[in-house]
Amino acid sequence: MGWLADYWWVVLLVLAGMLIGGVKALRRVDATSYLKNRPELPPHRDNNAQWDEEDDWPKKP
């Protein structure tokens, strides 16, 4: 870990570059265009349907 004490500034520069690159990439995203042209979701199957019929709660008088 001695190299980290000597080269902490390099690690900081790499992290700052990643942060700046991420912000730039997110600014290029056009959410309204995506929402207008988004693909339809395929129908999903309810995997809990077979357990929904079981009633584990006690009956109320």
Curated annotation (Swiss-Prot):
Keyword field contains Acyltransferase: no
Region (Disordered): 37-61
Record has Membrane as a keyword: yes
Any single Gene Ontology cellular-component annotation: plasma membrane
InterPro entries: UPF0370 (IPR020910)
Predominant location category: membrane
Composition bias type Acidic residues, residue spans: 51-61
Entry's family note: Belongs to the UPF0370 family.
Annotated protein name in UniProt: UPF0370 protein SG1720
